[in-house]
């Protein structure tokens, strides 16, 4: 799929520096910038001897990827969310690029459906790379949670909208999946049945290998409003 649309809000140009390409073999633990804001999710790198400054006018390569996602990188592959098309043809896409050359290696797209997301607010979360296998996880604004191998083979996907009832992400603010041992954890505002009937922001934990639900939780009390 060729992405040709760009906008002042959504056109993202990736500035790639030499130190982002990592060549660790997949048989070894995966190293890199594996999740939103890095290894400790605090925006800092554990790498040594990094450049003091980066010249934005001299990138190794650029790629036009509409969206507000940020890239994750491992073993020479860069993964990022974006979107393509308009109206009923709009799809959110996860794209894998060669971190050294910017060449597109693979891409998967999911159509939007029953979403209250405003245009240009798609693809706000980041993919997450599982450190043991290099598998990649994504969460879309339409409620799709999906897992892929580093080479782009789909392991599983799940439509949370269809399984867990009404689902929304205010202003398109989806979660970047979190890997915790054997679980992949995400969240969304849902309304279903029984204890999870009332609308609320809930966490969902799935088996990272199969996509089967392990637990769901609605922490804290529902917000209240008082008028005096």
PLM feature spans:
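Noncatalytic, solvent-exposed loop/strand surfaces
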Residues: 26-228
């Amino acid at each position: 799929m060729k992405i040709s649309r760009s906008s002042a809000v959504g056109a993202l140009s990736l500035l790639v520096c030499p130190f982002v390409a990592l060549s660790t073999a997949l048989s070894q633990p995966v190293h890199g910038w594996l999740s939103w804001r890095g290894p400790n999710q605090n925006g800092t790198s554990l790498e040594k001897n990094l450049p003091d400054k980066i010249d934005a006018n001299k990138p190794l390569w650029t790629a036009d990827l509409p969206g507000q996602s940020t890239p994750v990188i491992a073993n020479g592959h860069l993964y990022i969310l974006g979107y393509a098309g308009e109206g009923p043809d709009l799809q959110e896409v996860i794209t894998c690029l060669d971190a050294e050359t910017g060449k597109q290696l693979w891409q998967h797209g999911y159509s939007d459906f029953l979403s209250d997301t405003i245009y240009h607010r798609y693809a706000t979360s980041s993919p997450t790379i599982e450190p043991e296998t290099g598998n990649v996880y994504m969460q879309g604004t339409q409620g799709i949670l999906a897992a892929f191998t580093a080479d782009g083979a789909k392991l599983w996907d799940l439509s949370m909208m269809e399984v867990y009832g009404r689902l929304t992400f205010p202003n398109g603010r989806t979660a970047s999946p979190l890997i915790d041992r054997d679980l992949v954890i995400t969240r969304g505002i849902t309304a279903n049945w029984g204890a999870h009937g009332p609308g609320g922001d809930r966490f969902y934990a799935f088996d990272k290998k199969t996509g089967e639900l392990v637990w769901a939780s609605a922490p804290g009390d529902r917000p209240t409003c008082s008028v005096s």
